A protein has these predicted regions:
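Short loop/turn segments that connect beta-strands within beta-propeller blades
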Residues: 12-16, 53-57, 92-96, 131-135, ...
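Beta-propeller fold detector
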Residues: 19-23, 60-64, 99-103, 138-142, ...
């Protein structure tokens, strides 16, 4: 019997009911409502943006481009162009009404509140933001960043500095203007759930979590409990 571990999977929170929605390789995926928006891989065409229901049905091509669906909000996908340009776009979750809202050399787009955040590749990967309708960009973090994420309330940004001098994950509280390093070194995959920030070392060997309320920073070694 052959065993395949590639594809897009779903699983219940207690570790049961593992099922595969899509069998070929994929990268970025985003759950929004009862649909998953994900990068669908084709051996000839490469990565394209698709959507599917959470049961794997109604698989639909949205865009023939390797768009990363990091930010889906209010029935709108916000993304940066990939193939021919790197402008910031907005598009209905149906794939219709695609329009450019900011011209620039942008990546890692996240919509938070009334702003769209992005890394400005023309500005040494500084973190910038614009309004939902575009306009002038405002610089938020003046360091070269590798990745970042924002709390649900939009008040705190966690980011990885990648300038070769003071690399690490930092916490920027926008309400107070304070910056604090929470981990020194090189890390990836910053995810935020409630008061917890999860991240992984650059080699992918160790995962960590940081408690925003208490300031505790610990190794993350979960065990899966089954009914």
């Amino acid at each position: 019997m052959s065993l395949s571990t590639t594809g897009l999977f779903r699983i219940t929170k207690n570790g049961t009911d593992l099922s595969r929605l899509y069998e070929d390789p994929t990268q970025v995926a985003c759950l929004y409502g009862n649909h998953v928006y994900y990068q669908h891989y084709d051996h000839k065409k490469g990565l394209e943006l698709y959507s599917a229901k959470i049961d794997g049905s109604k698989n639909k091509l949205l865009k023939r481009e390797a768009i990363s669906p990091y930010s889906v909000s209010g029935n709108t996908i916000y993304y940066s162009g990939w193939a021919k340009e790197h402008n910031i776009h907005s598009m209905d979750i149906s794939g219709a009404n695609d329009k450019v809202i900011y011209n620039g050399n942008c990546t890692s787009v996240i919509k938070s509140g009334d702003y769209i955040y992005f890394l400005n590749m023309n500005q040494n990967y500084n973190l910038c933001r614009i309004g939902l309708d575009g306009g002038s960009a405002e610089t938020i973090v003046q360091y070269k960043l590798a990745t970042y994420n924002i709390t649900n309330d939009g008040n705190i940004i966690f980011y990885q500095v990648d300038n070769g001098q003071n690399n690490g994950i930092y916490m920027y509280d926008m309400s107070t203007g304070t910056n604090e390093q929470i981990a020194a070194g090189n890390f990836n995959f910053i995810h935020i759930i409630s008061d917890y920030v999860f991240y992984e070392d650059y080699e992918g060997k160790t995962a960590y979590y940081y408690n925003i309320s208490t300031g505790e920073n610990k190794n993350f070694n979960p065990t899966v409990e089954k009914d």
